[in-house]
Amino acid sequence: MNKNELVSAVAEKAGLTKSDAASAVDAVFDVVQAELKNKGDIRLAGFGSFTVSHRAATKGRNPSTGAEVDIPARNVPKFTPGKGLKDAVNG
């Protein structure tokens, strides 16, 4: 499912116009992104949690030259599914 399909599904399920549903979907994405950017987390009971995980700096190798490369530390988004979502997916 891509974003347009998600917007259509939300519009149909919630009885909204597609433009209202698109605004709602965009707002949710914006809030999640802003919260994670501020290193916060979002916990949705029964669905899952969006958190920020820190990856430490490490050394890597360029596969074509074999030269050692420094890989900088960075923060990455992480999603952990909740029990309700796991149960829904598994049947």
Swiss-Prot record:
Taxonomic source organism: Rhizobium leguminosarum
Keyword DNA-binding: yes
GO biological process: chromosome condensation
Listed name of the protein: DNA-binding protein HRL53
CDD domains membership: HU
Keyword DNA-binding attached: yes
GO MF annotations, alphabetized: DNA binding; structural constituent of chromatin
Function: Histone-like DNA-binding protein which is capable of wrapping DNA to stabilize it, and thus to prevent its denaturation under extreme environmental conditions. Binds to nod promoters and induces DNA binding.
Family: Belongs to the bacterial histone-like protein family.
The entry's keywords: DNA condensation, DNA-binding
One Pfam short name: Bac_DNA_binding
SUPFAM superfamilies: IHF-like DNA-binding proteins
Region called Disordered, residue ranges: 57-91
